Curated annotation (Swiss-Prot):
It comes from the Viruses. The modification Phosphoserine is found at S6. The virion-associated Nef proteins are cleaved by the viral protease to release the soluble C-terminal core protein. Nef is probably cleaved concomitantly with viral structural proteins on maturation of virus particles. Disulfide bonds: none annotated. Residues 62-65 are annotated as: Acidic. The record marks W57, L58 as: Cleavage. A lipid is attached at G2 (N-myristoyl glycine). It comes from Human immunodeficiency virus type 1 group M subtype B (isolate BH8) (HIV-1). A motif (Dileucine internalization motif) lies at residues 163-164. It is a lipid-anchor. This is Protein Nef.
Length: 205
């Protein structure tokens, strides 16, 4: 008799179960959806576009043309400590973020690309509030946001500069009106500055 769940079809289940058991935990500082993915292996009904800003944002991106598909080509999963460290070093080696002026749009593009290529739900790249240096809430992410010196901002003022370049926006994305740039700091892989400076963000972790 055997239906689709007969003994022969469950042969590989112990290996799958063991792999699930050994899955790395989500990194400290990730959002609610990543916590769902860690605990349940899926996004639960408590996190929908109506109840979670990250889900709503991701759903809205599916309507927009961003240059690549926004549906992940790999299984959806939470950002882990190891993945955050590895991704930080990968981007550093490729010269991707170091010294790049931060804007919400650029962060959104990065989040979508990582979501699409790696499957990490885009609720992990959050930072401490300003003014001053903004540290990543996700432990293992080695990029902080650092205010740009006025000299560097002034050097941007030329005829060939796009008015929509993030430096030209003079921090309009930022509540403190600071122009910020991504800066790699390898110490963030070992020292969770955000937890030290803002323990209130980690009460439910």
């Amino acid at each position: 008799m055997g239906g689709k769940w007969s003994k022969s079809s469950v042969v590989g289940w112990p290996a799958v179960r063991e792999r699930m058991r050994r899955a790395e935990p989500a990194a400290d500082g990730v959002g609610a959806v990543s916590r769902d993915l860690e605990k349940h292996g899926a996004i639960t009904s408590s996190n929908t576009a109506a109840t979670n800003a990250d889900c709503a944002w991701l759903e809205a991106q599916e309507e927009e043309e961003v240059g690549f598909p926004v549906t992940p080509q790999v299984p959806l999963r939470p950002m882990t400590y190891k993945a955050a460290v590895d991704l930080s070093h990968f981007l550093k080696e490729k010269g991707g973020l170091e010294g790049l002026i931060h804007s919400q749009r650029r962060q959104d593009i990065l989040d979508l690309w990582i979501h699409h290529t790696q499957g990490y739900f885009p609720d992990w790249q959050n930072y401490t509030p300003g003014p001053g240096v903004r540290y990543p809430l996700t432990f293992g992410w080695c990029y902080k946001l650092v205010p740009v010196e006025p000299e560097k901002e002034e050097a941007n003022k030329g005829e060939n500069t796009s008015l929509l370049h993030p430096v030209s926006l003079h921090g309009m994305d930022d509540p403190e009106r600071e122009v910020l740039e991504w800066r790699f700091d390898s110490r963030l892989a070992f020292h969770h500055m955000a937890r030290e400076l803002h323990p209130e963000y980690f009460k439910n972790c």
